[in-house]
Amino acid sequence: MSLMFDVDAAVYPFPAKPIRLSSDEKLAYRTKIKRLLQERDAVMVAHYYTDPDIQALAEETGGCVADSLEMARFGSQHSAATLLVAGVRFMGETAKILSPEKTILMPTLQAECSLDLGCPIDEFSRFCDAHPDRTVVVYANTSAAVKARADWVVTSSIAVELIEHLDSLGEKIIWAPDRHLGQYVQRQTSADILCWQSACIVHDEFKTQALQRMKLLYPEAAVLVHPESPQAIVDLADAVGSTSQLIQAAQTLPHRQMIVATDRGIFYKMQQACPDKELLEAPTAGEGATCRSCAHCPWMAMNGLKAIADGLEQGGSEHEILINDALREGALIPLNRMLTFAKDLKLKVRGNA
């Protein structure tokens, strides 16, 4: 356990929610964004957890809606000179790591991730230095600097297989930053894992008793859970997986109702995949002042239409992701190591949050 970061005591600097736009304002910004994408030779990639309006716009303009790794891979394979990344900052960094020749813009560089914030590089480096006999495995939801300090980068879709592989080689593991996912992987593999103690603010808020009550109200519903959730929530699941895996589970499970324990932004693509199914939000700590996220990442909410238009129009230091070459090359090594491992096992690597 890390004694250097207490996720329960952390007070995150949440941003103000974007100002609600009128229908006319939305139409004007959508038109402007489409024009700016063409003028900049840009393509827009949006994460599953952004608002439905943003995901729809990405699809309409030839971009993609995906998990963090697939967003970066789509951008690296696209001919556009510029990527507009609607997500949080580590996603923009991952795109830059895979596409150093492209201009990577974001609606705002202030869109953070509690997992990233909860694993600052200086403290994490000291933690790793204190355990030099352990292989360092970090989740994709980390800064470029933390990735560069690691031996492996991993996504939730391949985490169990990778840790099983390392355990078979007799390696002991440092896992960072998500404590819940680390504990889930440890239970699945029985590997020797030392977990950094950070958590996703959205998944950390799902509540066991409230979910049990909801299951009583909807006894025929399947429960879909992201493994960043606490163990007690995972234990109630019919399916556990990454964002892409949960969408697939919603398609393949026979249930007509789905209680979904992840960010509600996923409902846009999940409903596309399962138009005949009813999707229900899993309960969090409450609404308003009684919960911190209320099942929606406050930083993802910063990716509004106005912010996207500003990012494309203004560019510059307030919107462009820049990573020095040495750091980028250092972060690329463990990322490529994971991709090679997955290719050798013929596994489909999907991202996380």
From Swiss-Prot:
Superkingdom of origin organism: Bacteria
Pfam family, one: NadA
InterPro entries hit by this protein: NadA, NadA_sf, Quinolinate_synth_A_type1
Residues engaged in binding [4Fe-4S] cluster: 113, 200, 297
Major localization listed first in the record, in broad terms: cytoplasm
GO function terms (MF aspect): 4 iron, 4 sulfur cluster binding; metal ion binding; quinolinate synthetase A activity
Record GO biological process: 'de novo' NAD biosynthetic process from L-aspartate
Note on cofactor: Binds 1 [4Fe-4S] cluster per subunit.
Localization in the cell: Cytoplasm
Cofactors demanded by this protein: [4Fe-4S] cluster
EC number of the protein: 2.5.1.72
Keywords: 4Fe-4S, Cytoplasm, Iron, Iron-sulfur, Metal-binding, Pyridine nucleotide biosynthesis, Transferase
GO cellular component: cytosol
Binding-site positions, iminosuccinate: 47, 68, 139-141, 156, 226-228, 243
Reactions this protein catalyses: iminosuccinate + dihydroxyacetone phosphate = quinolinate + phosphate + 2 H2O + H(+)
Name of the top EC class for this enzyme: transferase
Family that this chain belongs to: Belongs to the quinolinate synthase family. Type 1 subfamily.
Function noted in UniProt: Catalyzes the condensation of iminoaspartate with dihydroxyacetone phosphate to form quinolinate.
Name of the molecule in the record: Quinolinate synthase
Organism this protein belongs to: Erwinia tasmaniensis (strain DSM 17950 / CFBP 7177 / CIP 109463 / NCPPB 4357 / Et1/99)
